[in-house]
Regions:
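Structural signal for interior beta-strand "rungs" in well-ordered beta-sheet cores
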Residues: 4, 9-190, 194-195
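Terminal amphipathic alpha-helical/low-complexity segments used for targeting or macromolecular assembly
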Residues: 1-13, 18, 24-25, 61, ...
Length: 264
């Protein structure tokens, strides 16, 4: 179902199945396929040779580059053709050869992606992942199933993330990181094997986090990684330190929710 304005923006070689819903000013490039159950919001541009399968909803002003695969079946041997979905927000950039898969019934049956994210070429988002806003996944970075990637996190090129792992807000993973346990908010990791390497103070400063909050986060990092405290004791001390700091409180709440342990 398309508006008349949309029809002029669909290349004649593109295939749009009948139940797909395209808002105004959506552009579909040559040889792309838009399947049944796909909804695309206003101003979104889909390049050539893109495949989008439903149920998938895509918000406004996204840019999807050539040869990307959006809303494909999950790569899970337990998947048995159940109806599951992919939800993508607004203003995301999805570069060439990226793949974003639908969810599975073993979780919430949906993969969720927020707003203003950048997925560079050859990135992969597996089934049931939940991604926040303003995330960057550099070329070749891949998320296994059920990963949570919180807002403003950055994954360097070819970073691999184990299933069910949580990566906190404003965290940073260097190129080629192998992440097998949770990464607390604001923490930088890298190396072989991948280990913590301080806090992402530059990213915090760029996003307007105050010098006082950065000082508190740096002190919390030392409690977790430098003072030989049990994690539970470090969390208790961080909670006492947090006061009115939303950032440090977010770090405490994240650590209390950890189930796989944190990368050390």
């Amino acid at each position: 179902m398309c508006s008349s304005g949309t029809l002029a923006l669909i290349h004649p070689s593109a295939i749009i199945e009948g139940s797909a819903e395209l808002a105004s000013n959506v552009a579909i490039g040559p040889y792309s396929f838009i399947g049944a159950g796909v909804k695309i919001g206003a101003g979104t541009v889909v390049g050539s040779h893109v495949v989008i399968k439903g149920p998938t909803s895509i918000g406004k002003e996204n840019r999807i580059y050539q040869f990307s695969s959006i809303g494909e079946d999950p790569q899970d041997k337990k998947y048995a053709n159940e109806i599951t979905s992919l939800e993508i927000g607004d203003r995301n950039t999805i570069r060439e050869f990226s793949s974003l898969h639908r969810g599975t019934k073993q979780d919430q049956s949906v993969t969720k992606i927020g707003n203003d994210n950048l997925f560079m070429a050859y990135t992969h988002v597996a089934h049931d992942c939940v991604i926040g806003d303003h995330v960057i996944m550099a070329n070749g970075a891949s998320l296994a199933g059920h990963v949570q990637l919180h807002s403003h996190a950055i994954l360097g090129g070819f970073t691999l993330v184990h299933q069910f792992t949580k990566i906190g807000q404003y965290s940073f993973a260097a190129m080629g990181s192998a992440i097998t346990q949770d990464i607390p908010p604001f923490v930088m990791v890298g190396g072989k094997p991948t280990r913590p390497h301080g806090i992402n103070s530059v990213g915090m400063e760029r996003n307007g986090i105050s010098a006082e909050d950065i000082r508190l986060i740096r002190k919390a990092y030392k409690m977790i990684y430098k003072m030989n405290l049990r994690l539970e004791d470090a969390i208790d001390q961080m909670e006492d330190l947090a006061g009115d700091s939303k950032e440090l409180s977010a770090m405490v709440n994240f650590l209390r929710s950890v189930s796989r342990g944190i990368l050390r």
